[in-house]
Design a protein with these regions (language model features):
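Helix-turn-helix
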Residues: 12, 20-67, 72
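C-terminal alpha-helix
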Residues: 220-228
């Protein structure tokens, strides 16, 4: 019979797990560390999650918008492959870019400036919305090769290649400014957006910038760089 749940305690445990994974990495995190950070005993922690793997799955699901309070307790232990697949699915769902899908479907956009601005803005919003999950995955990928491959090679690099192909097509049609190397240009676009939508929150001065003003300026400046 499932044990009665305490939503507040579950939230505290998952928040503690997120902070511990983000600070120590996946391999460096221990269940006892999470229990101490959550202010619970290790024994109680295991009544919520069977293992470190289960805790990581809980964190990823919560950051992906899953109602973890509806999950049966204790959460079972997934395999490493299942964890990597969960991260891949969660990030793919969070960073869908409909404006790029629409751009790929036409060779004659009615307004190239609006198209580029829309793509930049949607990238910004997608990264901003899942920045906590992105930071977690980036940190844990440092000591988890399979996760690194899923995130960087099968995830980010695939998207960078797609963005570069978009720039190639629009450049060949004369719709955007000439670009010598669209591979570098795609990384410039994505890394610029990623710093302002995500990494600046870990920067001493960057975190103080006004959120709305940052979004407006990033969209305007990147659009101007590409369209002229």
């Amino acid at each position: 019979m499932p044990r009665p749940r305490d939503p507040g305690r579950l939230d505290a445990i998952v928040a503690a797990a997120l902070a511990t994974f983000a600070a120590s990495g996946y391999r460096g995190t221990r269940m006892t560390d999470v229990a101490a950070a959550a202010g619970v005993s290790p024994g109680l922690l295991y009544t919520y999650a069977e293992s470190k793997e289960a805790l990581f799955a809980l964190v990823v699901q919560r950051e992906a918008g899953v109602d973890i309070a509806a999950l049966p307790l204790p959460v079972g232990t997934p395999s490493d492959d299942a964890l990597v697949a969960l991260v891949r699915r969660s990030l793919a769902a969070l960073v869908e870019v409909d404006t790029l899908d629409a751009a790929d479907a036409t060779d004659t956009p009615p307004d190239i400036r609006a198209e580029v601005a829309g793509i930049v803005a949607e990238h910004f919003d997608a990264i901003l919305s899942c920045r906590t999950l992105l930071r977690l995955v980036e940190r844990c990928a440092a000591d988890w090769p399979a996760l690194a491959a899923a995130f960087y090679e099968d995830g980010r690099q695939v998207h960078l290649d797609r963005l570069a192909r978009y720039l190639d097509r629009r450049g060949a049609a004369g719709l955007i400014a000439p670009i010598e190397d669209t591979t570098i240009a795609a990384r410039f676009v994505l890394e610029t957006i990623a710093w302002f939508a995500n990494h600046r929150y870990g920067d001493h001065d960057g975190a103080a910038l006004d959120d709305a003003a940052v979004r407006t300026e990033v969209v305007a400046l990147v659009t101007r760089a590409l369209v002229g």
